[in-house]
Amino acid sequence: MTIYIVDLEAVDTRYTKEWKKYLPLQLKRHTNSKVEVISGGNTPQATTPGAFLNFGGTNVYKAKQMQQIGEMFCNGKIKDGDYFLYTDAWNPTVLQLRYMAELLGIKIKIGGLWHAGSYDPQDFLGRLIGDKPWVRNTERSMFETYDNNFFASDFHINMFVDTFKEFGNYVGLTTDKTKVRRVGWPMEYLEGSMSAYK
């Protein structure tokens, strides 16, 4: 099995820069699996005013990731049992990933880390777009596409389920059938980097 990290673009002033370096190392150490990062390359560091990323740049980044994923399928690289971890679940390429895997009969698993979305009134999607049908239906579709939907806290899970009530039946299950999992974000690397400040 190979774990493919479909990462979020690294912004120097955010933890996404640290994840680019440390997340592959942590996953390799904890799973003993082969880990590969599917990166979209360099991205503009200037963020869209009022946001933490560049609204145009993030889509260029994701388009480059999608091209790589498509080529990996074309070249026969993706195998049964491979796992794709999206470090930001709000990535529409997950839909095309599932499309290719199912049409080609390749049994993969996909996980996504939900940071925010239209269901969060503090997020730019919640503030600027709100509950427009296109954004809500996109988030529903992405949720269903993921085998594992990872959230950092019960607060975040509750906020999601308050908006998408139909997904509440996944919360609290302790079987493999659950699609909702509360996990801590992968920041174990901070222990070493913060020890100097004790």
Language-model region placement:
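Short, flexible loop segments at the rims of nucleotide/cofactor-binding pockets, characterized by
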Residues: 58-62, 124-131
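N-terminal pre-catalytic "stem/leader" segment of glycosyltransferase-like enzymes
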Residues: 1-96
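Conserved donor-binding/catalytic core segment of Leloir-type glycosyltransferases
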Residues: 180-198
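A short, active-site helix/loop in glycosyltransferases that binds the activated sugar's phosphate group
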Residues: 133-179, 189
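A short acidic (Asp/Glu
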Residues: 14-18, 94-99, 122-125, 159-164, ...
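Active-site proximal beta-strand in glycosyltransferases
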Residues: 83-90, 101-124
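Catalytic phosphate/metal-binding cores of nucleic-acid and nucleotide-processing enzymes, i.e., regions
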Residues: 99-106, 165-166, 184-185
